[in-house]
Amino acid sequence: NDKFAIFLSGYYNKSDGFNNIPDSLRTEPDYSVARFMKEGGLYAKVLYNPTALFNVDLAYDLYRDKRGEGEKIQAPDGEYRHFNHNRVQSRFYGEKGKFSYQAALYFQRQDYFKLDERIKGGDYQRFDVKSHRGDWGAIMPLRLEGRHNAFALGGEFKNGSIDGGDHYVTSTDEVLNKGSIRILSVFAQDELSLFNKKIWLQVALRYDNAYFHKGWFEANGENVSDFNTYNGKLKNNRWEHLSPRVALRYNPTRAISAYISYSQGFRASILDDLCRSGWMWVGPKIANPELGPEQIDNYEIGGTFRLTKNLSFSPSLYYAKGKDFLYYVTTGEKMWGKRDIFQRQNVSKVDVKGIEADLNYIPFNGLKINLNYSYNNPKVKDFKEKPELNNKILTYAPKNQIKGYVLWTGGITDVMFRGRYKSKQYTTEDNSAAIDGFTIWDAQVSKWFFDHRLYVGGEIINMFDNRHMNTKDYMSAGRLMNIKVAVNINR
């Protein structure tokens, strides 16, 4: 039936994991263990295409996992986290002549659980993190093409909510948090083709309105007394922004394509930073309902130049000025008198300067070589509350990265070799500590059988077993070997 189709896919992964705490950071007693993992997913889609003007598809996405956190004291499985994710999405779309449209609706529910255990003052403590997140929304873009232009107009609505808490098992303590955020956006864009399609001009404007409300935080109990000063209803807040974009592309010949662009971006904070106080990946942190959105002005110039029939070069330079940049900083307060307490704050100004260059070479059919270099220099420029951070580089932002691959698809099997390099990365906001740069090499072999019905592949990641540090606390897994078998039932 050419008007009706069904797509179905699923997967399951399981691993005993590895212990990523280096010997130099282990303590006595040593509670570190391997970080196990098991996950599975199911995706189903039904498509109905009766006419060109009206088409519909309905999709369902299910994901569940259980991942060890690398520490075990008393709990049978040690510390772990678990996601139960369900998403339903429908899409209506079609076209007639120069007109086309889309309308997408979605709803998703995510139930999260994390078991956390620790030793404090010689006593065992355990608390379970439970949170329920609901998200729903819609987006509808309309597009009308003219002889020399293409005009688009649309709107988007997103609503997200969280109801979560840290529930202590070894005591009656609890930390509860709630909050909702609603974002309404409208946008318009026009693309103009000039001088026989040698020049393309794009002009766009987007309006965003974000509203944080229904915020609540409550901490009860002796073990969480450092947080109970923040108890109560959180302040409602609304932010709005108008974001323009202008881009110009020049194509004098088929071998040359150059562009210059300016755009402004707007990003509201996540609910965890607005309404949740507790433990995050940085450590203990407190909510900041006053946390405004992040804004950025981005300037970019670049292009693609075909140097020969088989060789192309694509360089770009960019400069971005961030305002009210979202960044975790220490508050100056201590938990238990020793652990820094963090809060996501708006850093007044951040400058990001960078270069990226991409080289693609196809010497003959079946062989492709790619080499990419990027330079990135993100610095705090004006942070009035913490002037000592001015001119410091953002954490986990390597200045230099090199990556590339060689891909052969002209033989019995497809073979790929790839490598990547990252330079030193600072791990503290004052740039007093850093992890060293590292280089990784991978190899992959794959092949389709039976007219693309059966896929068999294998890869070795980090062939030379480079046990570098991924963060200031955690070490990489080293050499990994994967085998993948997939069956395509849709052919």
Protein language model features and the residues they cover:
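Surface-exposed extracellular loop regions of Gram-negative outer-membrane beta-barrel proteins
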Residues: 3-20, 55, 59-66, 101-120, 159-166, 209-229, ...
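Repeated loop/turn-to-beta-strand initiation elements of outer-membrane beta-barrel proteins
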Residues: 3-6, 53-56, 98-101, 148-151, ...
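Extracellular loop and loop/strand-boundary signature of outer-membrane beta-barrel proteins
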Residues: 27-32, 69-80, 87, 119-130, ...
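Outer-membrane beta-barrel signature, preferentially recognizing the C-terminal barrel domain
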Residues: 74-95, 131, 175-183, 232-243, ...
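C-terminal beta-signal and adjacent terminal beta-strands/loops
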Residues: 15-21, 266, 321-323, 379, ...
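Transmembrane beta-barrel wall of Gram-negative outer-membrane proteins
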Residues: 1-14, 25-66, 84-96, 144-147, ...
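Gram-negative outer-membrane beta-barrel transporters
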Residues: 194-196, 201, 209, 314, ...
